[in-house]
Amino acid sequence: MGSTEQTTEILLCLSPVEVANLKEGINFFRNKSTGKDYILYKSKSRLRACKNVCKHQGGLFIKDIEDLAGRSVRCTKHNWKLDVSTMKYINPPESFCQDELVVEMDENNGLLLLELNPPNPWDSEPRSPEELDFGEVQITYLTHACMDLKLGDKRMVFDPWLIGPAFARGWWLLHEPPSDWLERLCQADLIYISHLHSDHLSYPTLKKLAGRRPDIPIYVGNTERPVFWNLNQSGVQLTNINVVPFGIWQQVDKNLRFMILMDGVHPEMDTCIIVEYKGHKILNTVDCTRPNGGRLPTKVALMMSDFAGGASGFPMTFSGGKFTEEWKAQFIKTERKKLLNYKAQLVKNLQPRIYCPFAGYFVESHPSDKYIKETNTKNDPNELNNLIKKNSDVITWTPRPGATLDLGRMLKDPTDSKGIIEPPEGTKIYKDSWDFEPYLEILNAAVGDEIFLHSSWIKEYFTWAGFKDYNLVVRMIETDEDFNPFPGGYDYLVDFLDLSFPKERPQREHPYEEIRSRVDVIRHVVKNGLLWDELYIGFQTRLQRDPDIYHHLFWNHFQIKLPLTPPNWRSFLTCCEQNGPGISQECKTT
C-alpha cells in the first residue's frame, strides 16, 4: 500500500489588490520566497494557471511578441510556444499539454495557486494489466450515479440513490431501478459514496440497506466537511463507515484496490475514485468540477462521469433584471453546449477505452416544479457519445437500468454482441410515478413545529449559522407551493454586516438579495440544521438580487460551512418557556 497521503500545497498567494489588478490575458508572477515562476491567464469566464516551466527541457516562458491575440508564451530555450488559454503547446503542435494548477479564491478575494502533491498518486506501485476472463469484471447500471461492479469474487457499489427524493423534494429518479436493487446492495462487499449531496448520499436508500446490513463497509474520502456529518441526525444505523486519506491505494484483495481523490474546485466536499482490478483501471469522476486538480490517468479501461448539467438553481430560480425567460433559455442552451464540448474534449484527452455518461439521470417530477422541469433542460447522453465518437476511437456506452457491461469482452472485442447485455425486452426504463407523500409529510411536519411559534427563532438560527461581518442584506420570505407569501409565515430582514434583524433596509449602501422559500423546506432545513443545497440545488427558492452579483462567501457558508451539529432547539424552547409569552423576541440560548 502507498504511504504518502495526497495533500494540497500552496505555491503562490496573491493579495486582493493584486487580484484586482490582474489584466486580461497573460500575467507573470514570481514567488519571491521560493524563486519559482508562474503564469496566470485571465479571460472573462475563468482564470487558468501553470508553472512557468517548459515541458520540453525546463526553459522559462516569456511573452510571445508574435502573438497579437495575447494568448501564447515562448520558451527562451528552444522557442517552444504554449497557448495559455488552452494549456496546449502550439509549437510544435500536438506535442504536450501543460499541467494546470488549481486556482482558488480565499475569503478576502485574494488568490491561491495550489498543487496536489503527489500529483499522480496512482502511479505508485504500478501494475501491468492482466487478461480478464469473460464475466470476471461486470459493471451493471442501476440508476443515476449508482453502479454495481463485480470484480472477481468481490462486489462494489457506487453512490446508491435508489428511492425517494434528493435535495428536499426537488430531484426524483428518472430511471426505474432494477427490482432486485436492494438484494444487490446487500450482497456488496463495499460501497463508495463520493460526497454528501443527497443524490449520492441517500439516507432513504441507506435506511433500507441498514435494516438488512448495518455493518456493510462504506468508504468515503477524508473531506473537510465529513460525508456523514449528519448521520446521527438521520437516524440511520450504519456501523462500518471508513474515512480514507486521499491518494493512497486501499487494498481489498490481491487483485483489487481503489484510491479516492479530491476535487480541485470543491476539495472540502467532492471526491472521485479509481478502482483497479488486475491492473485495469476504472475511473469514476462523479460530480467533480476538476477531479484531482485536472490531473487524471490516461488510457484507463473504463471512464464514467457526469454529463447532464442542470444541478443548480441558476438561472431558473432567478427573476428581475436580465433574468427574462429568453435570457434564461439562451444561457441554459449555451451552458449545456459548453459542458458537452468540455466532456467530449476531456474524454479525447484522456483516451479511455470505454466511456459512460452517468450521474445525470434525475427529473423535477413533482407537479409544483413543472416550470423547472420545462426550463431546466439536460444534455442528452447519446449526443455526447456521438460527439466523442466523431473525434476519437473511444467506445461509448449509454447505460439503461439493469444493463451490464462485460469489461473483459469489450476490451478484447468491442463488437462482441455479449459485451453489453441490455435489460430484457419490456423492462421499464423510465419512472412514470413517484411516491411523493411519505417524503412531503416529513417536510410538512416542520411547518407546525413549536420552534416557529417564537419569532426569536430567527435570531437563534442565524447566530448559530455563524455568518457575519459581510456587507449583505437578505430578505427571507416564507411562501406556499407557488412562491406566494405563506399566510402567517415569516418575512424578515437579516443584515449580515452586524448580524442584526432590522425592520427596514439600512440607509448605507449595501447589496441586497430577496430569497423566497417554500415554507415546508425552509423550516425543515432550519429545524435540522441542514445545508442550503436543499433549497438552492433543490429549486425550492426564488431569488432576486441587486446588484446582480454572486455573493460567494455567503452562499458557500450556507451550502458547505454551517456547524456540524444542529441548533439546540430544546434549550431554546426551555428558555422561551421560562421567559413566558410576549418576550420571546429576546429569548436566546447560551
Swiss-Prot record:
The keyword Iron is annotated on this UniProt entry: yes
Gene3D superfamilies: Ribonuclease Z/Hydroxyacylglutathione hydrolase-like, Rieske [2Fe-2S] iron-sulphur domain
EC number(s) from the headed UniProt entry: 1.14.18.2
Subcellular location: Cytoplasm
Protein keywords: 2Fe-2S, Cytoplasm, Electron transport, Iron, Iron-sulfur, Metal-binding, Oxidoreductase, Transport
Segments forming a coiled coil: none
Positions annotated to bind [2Fe-2S] cluster: C54, H56, C75, H78
Reactions performed catalytically: CMP-N-acetyl-beta-neuraminate + 2 Fe(II)-[cytochrome b5] + O2 + 2 H(+) = CMP-N-glycoloyl-beta-neuraminate + 2 Fe(III)-[cytochrome b5] + H2O
GO cellular component, one term: cytoplasm
Cofactor annotation remark: Binds 1 [2Fe-2S] cluster per subunit.
Job description of the protein: Sialic acids are components of carbohydrate chains of glycoconjugates and are involved in cell-cell recognition and cell-pathogen interactions. Catalyzes the conversion of CMP-N-acetylneuraminic acid (CMP-Neu5Ac) into its hydroxylated derivative CMP-N-glycolylneuraminic acid (CMP-Neu5Gc), a sialic acid abundantly expressed at the surface of many cells.
Name of the molecule in the record: Cytidine monophosphate-N-acetylneuraminic acid hydroxylase
Gene behind the chain: CMAH
